[in-house]
């Protein structure tokens, strides 16, 4: 693991952290039981198999 050679100032640390942004999950349309829902792509298979409750929102 990389270790810093010098201490990083508080201002530099906070400005570096502020650049990090979370990305929104890409929603994909899926039809389950005749109803259309939008779910993240990683949950698509679970939604089709009925492993997650899509009516609870």
From Swiss-Prot:
It comes from Mycobacterium ulcerans (strain Agy99). One of its GO terms (molecular function) is structural constituent of ribosome. This is Large ribosomal subunit protein bL32. Residues 1-21 are annotated as: Disordered. Keywords: Ribonucleoprotein, Ribosomal protein. Residues 1-19 have a biased composition (Basic residues). GO terms for biological process: translation. The keyword rRNA-binding does not apply. The keyword Ribonucleoprotein applies. The gene is rpmF. It holds the Pfam family Ribosomal_L32p. HAMAP family: Ribosomal_bL32. One of its GO terms (cellular component) is large ribosomal subunit. Belongs to the bacterial ribosomal protein bL32 family.
